[in-house]
Amino acid sequence: MTAILERRESTSLWGRFCNWITSTENRLYIGWFGVLMIPTLLTATSVFIIAFIAAPPVDIDGIREPVSGSLLYGNNIISGAIIPTSAAIGLHFYPIWEAASVDEWLYNGGPYELIVLHFLLGVACYMGREWELSFRLGMRPWIAVAYSAPVAAATAVFLIYPIGQGSFSDGMPLGISGTFNFMIVFQAEHNILMHPFHMLGVAGVFGGSLFSAMHGSLVTSSLIRETTENESANEGYRFGQEEETYNIVAAHGYFGRLIFQYASFNNSRSLHFFLAAWPVVGIWFTALGISTMAFNLNGFNFNQSVVDSQGRVINTWADIINRANLGMEVMHERNAHNFPLDLAAVEAPSTNG
């Protein structure tokens, strides 16, 4: 009898690392995108927490008037924010080693640029990690495609808009009231409410909420009863069961009679594709709208577009919005310039004397 002993090849340390990184048996999948995602998101999160608590005021407008954003400098959870990098820095890459000191780096809002750039890289890698895990499990790639919508929106407000406006100081502050301030100023300067891409985004978000609520309530109302009246209907479901958990025919019939027949999906797959695609496409359009308005391709301007036979203006809601925009622009950066840009651009009347 002859025994053949096969020598087991020793796997290198790099090989074991590659196998561990790409293994779908791990409790949390890491993947090659995760190798970059983990340090970037940890860096962004750590600096955000420290800066939100203790960062000193930042000279956001570049006029030696620092704005406080951290908790230790008088703010609360609502008013606190990471103040964007100073207009004096503009679009320059501003890591710590480019400043003369850490104090100067903090005064010019260096943490904002650090957080934003690491965050955008991290969420892009998270999207790639979703695709990578789907690929290794033999799934279709639509999870990553859906996640591309919020990634595009974040990239638009944190990167594309500052590039178009010429300074990171125009980026969205990282805080609750800072976000509201960004929205108000954006409306004042770009008339975003009158931009069709923003309208599509509103339809996507509100429509997606409506469709999600309709779908969830229809499914919950047409569950196949597997329990007694004294038990929760949820107890009748077992994870991984092959049987349908709700009666799609009953849900289809109800909704078809509630509105009209063809308003109801009779294909569960096309229904769920629609539920995913509607808000995703809407948010894509919003991100595209922000990116175009970044370069001052603004919303529609219907100011003074209705006049009577004598040429007198008949005010419409467009004129009311325009007046509100001017008021918001007057209050924005009120110490950085004497007049809002729209008013300062008007040619001064000639004087005789």
Curated annotation (Swiss-Prot):
Role according to the record: Photosystem II (PSII) is a light-driven water:plastoquinone oxidoreductase that uses light energy to abstract electrons from H(2)O, generating O(2) and a proton gradient subsequently used for ATP formation. It consists of a core antenna complex that captures photons, and an electron transfer chain that converts photonic excitation into a charge separation. The D1/D2 (PsbA/PsbD) reaction center heterodimer binds P680, the primary electron donor of PSII as well as several subsequent electron acceptors.
Protein name from the UniProt record: Photosystem II protein D1
Record-marked site positions (Cleavage): A344, A345
A Pfam family assignment: Photo_RC
Organism: Magnolia fraseri var. pyramidata (Pyramid magnolia)
Binding residues annotated for a quinone, in chain numbering: H215, S264, F265
Compartments in which it is found: Plastid, Chloroplast thylakoid membrane
Site (Tyrosine radical intermediate) location in chain: Y161
Family the entry assigns: Belongs to the reaction center PufL/M/PsbA/D family.
Residues noted as binding chlorophyll a PD1 in the record, renumbered to the chain: H198
Source species taxonomy: Eukaryota, Viridiplantae, Streptophyta, Embryophyta, Tracheophyta
Cofactor info, note text: The D1/D2 heterodimer binds P680, chlorophylls that are the primary electron donor of PSII, and subsequent electron acceptors. It shares a non-heme iron and each subunit binds pheophytin, quinone, additional chlorophylls, carotenoids and lipids. D1 provides most of the ligands for the Mn4-Ca-O5 cluster of the oxygen-evolving complex (OEC). There is also a Cl(-1) ion associated with D1 and D2, which is required for oxygen evolution. The PSII complex binds additional chlorophylls, carotenoids and specific lipids.
